[in-house]
Amino acid sequence: MIRLRRPAVAAIGLLTLAAAVALPLWTLADGTTSHPTVTLPTLPTTTVPTTSGTVSPSTAATDNGAVLLKAPIIKQDLALDCESAALQVALAVQNIDVPQDQIYASLPQDARPPVIGSYGYPSKWGDPFKDFVGDVNGYEPSFTGYGVYYPPIVTAAERYGAIANGHTGWSVAQIESQLHLGNSVVIWLTSDFKPHVPQYWTAWDGVRVPWAIGEHAVPVIGYDTIKDTITFVDVLYGVERTLSTEAFAAAMTTFGGMGISVSATF
């Protein structure tokens, strides 16, 4: 059952919201198409502090230039359903309650195994921009399962009554602006929260797909412009984490700043 309640969000500060852009497909010299290539900056690594988390909501707190949304601190149910868990949190912030398994069940699936190339990496596999790729109970390093990118998650959010907007190229300023408005944000990065150079496989339809081991999606729930930090729920472990804005911005580059915003329609 989906339960709707009036949202309760506190926020302080004002940032400029940049317009969303659609994910392009590039035509390569050999006539094939590709999702965008990502260029990574060189930035220092940062220690990631953790706090214990339960299924109870976090406390909404504000200070000058800071926002922390009321969000449940939950853990993903399955090995690779971080995107569904992240959306569950994002919807809950908007007071739209949808079970994690229901979100995952609504996603299009491509369970076909990959074609492994000569270096032991997938040369062909499904397109996570269209489907959940692989077995949700699989293991990424063995390429038995992978995940899903933002377009199907946008569709799922809209299915449950939210307004969702997804694109690549998210910046920290855009994230903070959305949080200031009380909107939820989900960002794609890797589970070690560090920048990586993505690899590419070719989808069944010939489109090149960027990928990285440890693909992960997290709901961002707060920021502090004085401490220069970003706070999010790590649904892999069910904890709240805080990174420096510099470290978070670097981690986002692995998937080209991929993310979605989610807001209520009431």
Write out the residue ranges for each language-model feature.
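Noncatalytic regulatory segments and standalone regulatory/sensor domains
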Residues: E158, H180, W201-A212, P219-F266
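Mid-length scaffold segments of soluble, non-membrane domains
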Residues: G134-V172, S177-H180
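Structural recognition of the beta-strand scaffold that forms the well-ordered cores
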Residues: D81-E83, N165-G166, V185-L189, P219, ...
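Extracytoplasmic/secreted envelope proteins and their assembly/folding machinery
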Residues: E83-L91, Q100, Y104, Y150-E158, ...
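Active-site-adjacent structural segments surrounding the nucleophilic cysteine of cysteine proteases
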Residues: P7-G13, A20-Y150, S191-F193, P198-T202, ...
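Short, solvent-exposed, low-complexity loop/linker segments
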Residues: E176-P195
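Terminal targeting segments of Actinobacterial cell-envelope proteins
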Residues: M1-R5
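A mature extracytoplasmic/lumenal domain signature
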Residues: A86, T168-W170, L189-F193, G222-D224, ...
